[in-house]
Amino acid sequence: LKSLTVLAESPVESRELLTELGVEKVIVEGKTAARVTQGDSDKPKQVPPNQEGKEEAPVATAAQPKEPAEQPDAKEGPAEGQQPGGVDNAAEASPAAVSPSRPQPAESEVGNSSPGEKGSDAPSTEARGMELEGKEEEGEAMVEDEEEAKIPKAAQPKSESKENAEDNESGSTDSGQENSGETRLLRSGTYSDRTESKAYAAVTHKCEDCGKEFTHTGNFKRHIRIHTGEKPFSCRECNKAFSDPAACKAHEKTHSPLKPYGCEECGKSYRLISLLNLHKKRHTGEAKYRCDDCGKLFTTSGNLKRHQLVHSGEKPYQCDYCGRSFSDPTSKMRHLETHDTDKEHKCPHCDKKFNQVGNLKAHLKIHIADGPLKCRECGNEFTTSGNLKRHLRIHSGEKPYVCVHCQRQFADPGALQAHVPIHTGEKPCQCLICGKAFTQASSLIAHVRHDTGEKPYVCERCGKRFVQSSQLANHIRHHDNIRPHKCTVCNKAFVNVGDLSKHIIIHTGEKPFLCDKCGRGFNRVDNLRSHVKTVHQGKAGMKILEPEDGSELNIVTVASDDMVTLATEALAATAVTQLTVVPVAAAVTADETEALKAEITKAVKQVQEADPNTQILYACDSCGEKFLDATSLAQHVRIHTAQALVMFQADTDFYQQYGAAAATWQTEQVIPATELLFRPRDSPQEAPAAPLAPVPLAGEGQAPAE
């Protein structure tokens, strides 16, 4: 203790004494700390707040009275920086402590201190000596404690980093230091620097049901809802439930008719900005996913994969009710609504029913007066811009969708899609009861209900029942006398566009409904059905000619010198013995149909006058189809715009008049099966044998040849 009391009287002796005590490191580091402190004295010193109850400032304050007490002369300035107790004081000392040439404060200034401070000098010195003796026994532990007491805060990076780490764990941030670029240790033992540490990626969540792993807890929770079926998020408009909040938010926007996100290139609007961004890629050329079959571009690989199912024909999504398959799940969901007859949501304006409240709300936009989606031509209103565009094509006559098989044009893509199976023969919808197949599911449903007698759609005004909801909707328009579709030629109005299309055919003369048996055209499909039932199924007095006793049919013809003869396989298969043609104009128009009918009738009368018992059969010289009356043949010839062939069956007496000559003419004119015979128009026709002279046309005043 005596050695420590006179420690500051001689710097050399102090150094030697402390070396013997094993605390030389304190002296050396004290100098270094003093020099560092003196060099930084001009800069503002950052004094961090006291943390965790550490009172470091009172230690430096208590060391201040030691210097005057131990050095009464106060003339050796550099020795102050070497004293263990004056290191902290040197950083805040007067300029005399920095420069040894300047005088130190007088002893009287020290005497101005309070008596309590003077009285604390002796206890402080004794405590210091006892502390050094304890540290001498503990070795380096004393050195670390002295460093913490003497080194300024700016020179303690380790302690500061520990304190900052504690602050970061508690959520606070030290304003004096920023730990950007440093790796912080979190409570979980992982590192916050995701790019430098692999511990973050190693933390995964594994699904026990399917084994899928996730690195984010939120994604893992959303995935779990797939297995549990939990849907905690519901729409505020229709109460539809969702398992994901983003999907719920996107769904709620569908209830709003507003589409605030518009494309600057084409003006198309979208409800979601994500859909707009995908649309813009088509203009910028960023749609990099190209179909190898048709060259169409897509913005996402998912859309490309769904599109490729069209070319491959793969339809993995199958309806559980009718067995119809679809290439995407959205089409299947729309199809399933056709099987759902429980439509509890009813429109208060037009009595139309829906199976979902969202569809009802979309329908209610039709009844909004002066709505944004209103046709300027007829005033009809629509819920979507797509439906309005398709409707406007009715007024403009635009038909951008063309069938690749027959080049027929359509205004609606759905109509084209329903038309294509006519050429391909595809009928995916098959009745499980009778096996009959249909091209559309709606036709199958109507067929099943027709067999069962089910008519679930009832008109509340008159009680009439219907098989399909569209039939009921059209029926209700008749009650309300709503006829929005008007003919531009005669201004006649119709309830639906289908009736208008049927009416327009009257003005154009078009007969698009053709009979596949005889080729006759009709302007209405119901007329075609009536024709097939009455003509081609043995009804309405149709004469079916059959040979008696196994003999072949004998045919007598009416001929002309300037006609074209065209025999086909169909004619050859009927065991014909003789054939010629009736004179008809080369091209038959709609106005010339009656004239053609009159010409054929005259030729028939001429033959009937010769033999009243003759049975008559009419046939087309272009395709060989046979008919029962002149009207049917005249209508059919319009399809080919060619000549008409009239075939007659004569009785046995007629052929007996010609004897062997008839057999000779027969061998010359019989057409073998599967052989086609063409004669050019301007080539002279070979005259038959003399006994079989052609019968002249009626009206020329000549009797049949005998």
Swiss-Prot record:
<dbReference type="GO" id="GO:0002682">
    <property type="term" value="P:regulation of immune system process"/>
</dbReference>
<keyword id="KW-0238">DNA-binding</keyword>
<feature type="zinc finger region" description="C2H2-type 2">
    <location>
        <begin position="233"/>
        <end position="255"/>
    </location>
</feature>
<keyword id="KW-0479">Metal-binding</keyword>
<keyword id="KW-0862">Zinc</keyword>
<feature type="zinc finger region" description="C2H2-type 6">
    <location>
        <begin position="345"/>
        <end position="367"/>
    </location>
</feature>
<feature type="compositionally biased region" description="Polar residues">
    <location>
        <begin position="170"/>
        <end position="182"/>
    </location>
</feature>
<feature type="zinc finger region" description="C2H2-type 11">
    <location>
        <begin position="485"/>
        <end position="507"/>
    </location>
</feature>
<keyword id="KW-0804">Transcription</keyword>
<feature type="zinc finger region" description="C2H2-type 10">
    <location>
        <begin position="457"/>
        <end position="479"/>
    </location>
</feature>
<feature type="region of interest" description="Disordered">
    <location>
        <begin position="32"/>
        <end position="194"/>
    </location>
</feature>
<keyword id="KW-0863">Zinc-finger</keyword>
<dbReference type="InterPro" id="IPR041697">
    <property type="entry name" value="Znf-C2H2_11"/>
</dbReference>
<dbReference type="GO" id="GO:0005654">
    <property type="term" value="C:nucleoplasm"/>
</dbReference>
<dbReference type="GO" id="GO:0000978">
    <property type="term" value="F:RNA polymerase II cis-regulatory region sequence-specific DNA binding"/>
</dbReference>
<feature type="zinc finger region" description="C2H2-type 1">
    <location>
        <begin position="205"/>
        <end position="227"/>
    </location>
</feature>
<feature type="region of interest" description="Disordered">
    <location>
        <begin position="680"/>
        <end position="706"/>
    </location>
</feature>
<feature type="domain" description="BTB">
    <location>
        <begin position="1"/>
        <end position="12"/>
    </location>
</feature>
<protein>
    <recommendedName>
        <fullName>Zinc finger and BTB domain-containing protein 17</fullName>
    </recommendedName>
</protein>
<feature type="compositionally biased region" description="Low complexity">
    <location>
        <begin position="90"/>
        <end position="106"/>
    </location>
</feature>
<comment type="function">
    <text>Transcription factor that can function as an activator or repressor depending on its binding partners, and by targeting negative regulators of cell cycle progression. Plays a critical role in early lymphocyte development, where it is essential to prevent apoptosis in lymphoid precursors, allowing them to survive in response to IL7 and undergo proper lineage commitment. Has been shown to bind to the promoters of adenovirus major late protein and cyclin D1 and activate transcription. Required for early embryonic development during gastrulation. Represses RB1 transcription.</text>
</comment>
<dbReference type="GO" id="GO:0000122">
    <property type="term" value="P:negative regulation of transcription by RNA polymerase II"/>
</dbReference>
<comment type="similarity">
    <text>Belongs to the krueppel C2H2-type zinc-finger protein family.</text>
</comment>
<dbReference type="GO" id="GO:0008270">
    <property type="term" value="F:zinc ion binding"/>
</dbReference>
<feature type="zinc finger region" description="C2H2-type 12">
    <location>
        <begin position="513"/>
        <end position="536"/>
    </location>
</feature>
<dbReference type="Pfam" id="PF16622">
    <property type="entry name" value="zf-C2H2_11"/>
</dbReference>
<keyword id="KW-0539">Nucleus</keyword>
<dbReference type="Pfam" id="PF00096">
    <property type="entry name" value="zf-C2H2"/>
</dbReference>
<feature type="zinc finger region" description="C2H2-type 13">
    <location>
        <begin position="618"/>
        <end position="640"/>
    </location>
</feature>
<dbReference type="GO" id="GO:0001817">
    <property type="term" value="P:regulation of cytokine production"/>
</dbReference>
<feature type="compositionally biased region" description="Basic and acidic residues">
    <location>
        <begin position="67"/>
        <end position="78"/>
    </location>
</feature>
<feature type="zinc finger region" description="C2H2-type 9">
    <location>
        <begin position="427"/>
        <end position="450"/>
    </location>
</feature>
<keyword id="KW-0805">Transcription regulation</keyword>
<feature type="zinc finger region" description="C2H2-type 3">
    <location>
        <begin position="261"/>
        <end position="283"/>
    </location>
</feature>
<feature type="zinc finger region" description="C2H2-type 7">
    <location>
        <begin position="373"/>
        <end position="395"/>
    </location>
</feature>
<feature type="compositionally biased region" description="Acidic residues">
    <location>
        <begin position="134"/>
        <end position="148"/>
    </location>
</feature>
<feature type="zinc finger region" description="C2H2-type 8">
    <location>
        <begin position="401"/>
        <end position="423"/>
    </location>
</feature>
<feature type="compositionally biased region" description="Low complexity">
    <location>
        <begin position="687"/>
        <end position="698"/>
    </location>
</feature>
<dbReference type="InterPro" id="IPR013087">
    <property type="entry name" value="Znf_C2H2_type"/>
</dbReference>
<feature type="zinc finger region" description="C2H2-type 4">
    <location>
        <begin position="289"/>
        <end position="311"/>
    </location>
</feature>
<dbReference type="GO" id="GO:0001227">
    <property type="term" value="F:DNA-binding transcription repressor activity, RNA polymerase II-specific"/>
</dbReference>
<dbReference type="InterPro" id="IPR036236">
    <property type="entry name" value="Znf_C2H2_sf"/>
</dbReference>
